[in-house]
Structure formats: C-alpha cells, structure tokens
C-alpha cells in the first residue's frame, strides 16, 4: 500500500460480465421501501416545508437523497449547485473528510 503513489498505478481489469448497472427502477423501489420505515410521518407532515439544505459534497447522493426527502413529503429542499457535480477531487471544499479538521 505504501508503494502506491497514484491511483493510476493500480492495474485492475474487472470482469464486465459480473457488473450489473442498476437503474431508476431500483432507486424507485428503494425509496418506496424507505418511506415505509419513517419513525414519525406525523412530524414530517407538520414540518414538510422546513428548509433542508443538502449537499452531496461532490458525491453520488445528488439524485437519490433529494428524491428520498421528497418521497417522505418534504417540500423545501435546497441544494448547493457547486457541489452537485460528482468529483473525487472535491474542488469546492477544503477538507471533504469530516473526521479531519479543516485547514
């Protein structure tokens, strides 16, 4: 591990026959199931217009999390457009890891 200086040095050839891309239908089923386990649907109903600011911080939750919040009934979901772009470089944040103190 300590000898790898760049991710491009890792040579991996995956078996494409074993990779199955899941699509919107799986996301929809997941969200449908997720909404059945709400701990307090009444509270969500009372506070559905509560302002929720969500950012995936350049991760992959950009579509699924807002869709899940909407499915729960929240109506005032605000996203951070600059951080909606999926990027492992995290160009808009100083430290993307919350376990590390910001510089």
Named regions from a protein language model:
Residues 1-102:
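Gly/Ser/Thr-enriched, mixed-charge loops and adjacent short helices
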